Every structure is written in C-alpha cells, then in structure tokens.
Amino acid sequence: MHSRFVKVKCPDCEHEQVIFDHPSTIVKCIICGRTVAEPTGGKGNIKAEIIEYVDQIE
C-alpha cells in the first residue's frame, strides 16, 4: 500500500486543494463543501479531478 498526497480540483468551484489519497473520513472542498473524496477501506474514491501527485507539501 503506497499512500500519497494528491492535488485535486473541485468540479463545482474549481478550488484546488491537497488531500490524502487513502482518506479515513469523507473529504469536502473547503470552499463550497462538495465531497471530493470518500473512504473505501483502501485507496479512496476521489470524486474530483486529480491535478498532480505531491511529493512534498510546501
């Protein structure tokens, strides 16, 4: 299991945020509240556009 952080773009408001690709809780957009990722017991169900995989968070 290789866990990573990903930068995603919300399909509703186009806000970009960095999330964990194996979430243990529902992840919502911090601007509009739309669900962008759901837990599945492993790799999450990402419901937003994945822009890039992040190696380091600045």
From Swiss-Prot:
It comes from the Archaea. A zinc finger (C4-type) spans 10-32. Belongs to the eukaryotic ribosomal protein eS27 family. The lineage of its organism: Archaea, Methanobacteriati, Methanobacteriota, Archaeoglobi, Archaeoglobales. InterPro entries: Ribosomal_eS27, Ribosomal_eS27_Zn-bd_dom_sf, Ribosomal_zn-bd. Its cofactor is Zn(2+). PROSITE patterns: RIBOSOMAL_S27E. The gene is rps27e. GO terms for molecular function: structural constituent of ribosome; zinc ion binding. Zn(2+) binds at residues 10, 13, 29, 32. GO terms for biological process: translation. Keywords: Metal-binding, Ribonucleoprotein, Ribosomal protein, Zinc, Zinc-finger. GO terms for cellular component: ribonucleoprotein complex; ribosome. Binds 1 zinc ion per subunit. Pfam families: Ribosomal_S27e. This is Small ribosomal subunit protein eS27. Part of the 30S ribosomal subunit. It comes from Archaeoglobus fulgidus (strain ATCC 49558 / DSM 4304 / JCM 9628 / NBRC 100126 / VC-16).
